Amino acid sequence: MSHTMSQSQPTTVKHDTLFTTPLDKAARFSFDEQVVACFPDMIRRSVPGYGQVLAMLPIFARRHCKYRQQSDSGQRVSRIYDLGCSLGAASMTLAGEFEPQDLQIKAIDISPAMTTEATTLLNDNYPEHDIEVITADIRDIELEPCDMVILNLTLQFLPAADRVAVLEKIYVALSEGGILVLTEKTHAFDEQYDAWLVERYYDFKRANGYTEMEISGKRNALENVLITDTLDEHHARLSDVGFQRHLTWFQFLNFVSIVAFK
């Protein structure tokens, strides 16, 4: 049944110290080599519930990946897209729970620094699995028919005007019975609720060792780079592109994960 995941991150994980010194306020966050070097630590300490979201992906895949596609060799497989894959954590989580012949995974990210490291990690840990890492803008690629699409903390980095088109493309590519897993940071429509959630999120980061300077520095760097939607906006957009059924299956403070059914 499963292959135990032997390694899901670089052998030497650098501590996230990117914002320990004051930065130029005009500097913007980017997924460059510096971020790649400490990315696992950054995610662990700044994205509540990320591990739980990853752990559920194989469970969802077991239910909805029904080998509806065909590999180059003619074998029945389930094709899965990991869009905005970063270091390939979602792809590795899936590979660790499926036989190599069961899945064809396409992991895509716009950052060459990310895809270079992801390729190394995936090749080192799952050399027998059919996993292709692609450096590309997800707005520009054509999706092949697939059983599952993972969009973890990715849509929020796209211009708002481009988000519908990406979701439309995903909806068309999904086979009947397939799913989209959409995980995003959100904001609440009510300003008081949102302020409470944001402050509790900063408390979460403080509890994980981030200083006030680091919290402020990253907030400034992400301004106009990471643009959140409300939960209602996400659900409305999914309905608009054709998904008739979608639900919020996970929420931790202002981070949510939605599953949408084709």
UniProtKB/Swiss-Prot annotation:
Pfam families: Methyltransf_25
Entry's Gene Ontology molecular function annotations: carboxyl- or carbamoyltransferase activity; S-adenosyl-L-methionine binding
Enzyme Commission (EC) number: 2.1.3.-
Leading EC class: transferase
Function: Catalyzes the conversion of S-adenosyl-L-methionine (SAM) to carboxy-S-adenosyl-L-methionine (Cx-SAM).
PANTHER family: CARBOXY-S-ADENOSYL-L-METHIONINE SYNTHASE, TRANS-ACONITATE 2-METHYLTRANSFERASE-RELATED
Protein's recorded name: Carboxy-S-adenosyl-L-methionine synthase
Source organism of the structure: Psychrobacter cryohalolentis (strain ATCC BAA-1226 / DSM 17306 / VKM B-2378 / K5)
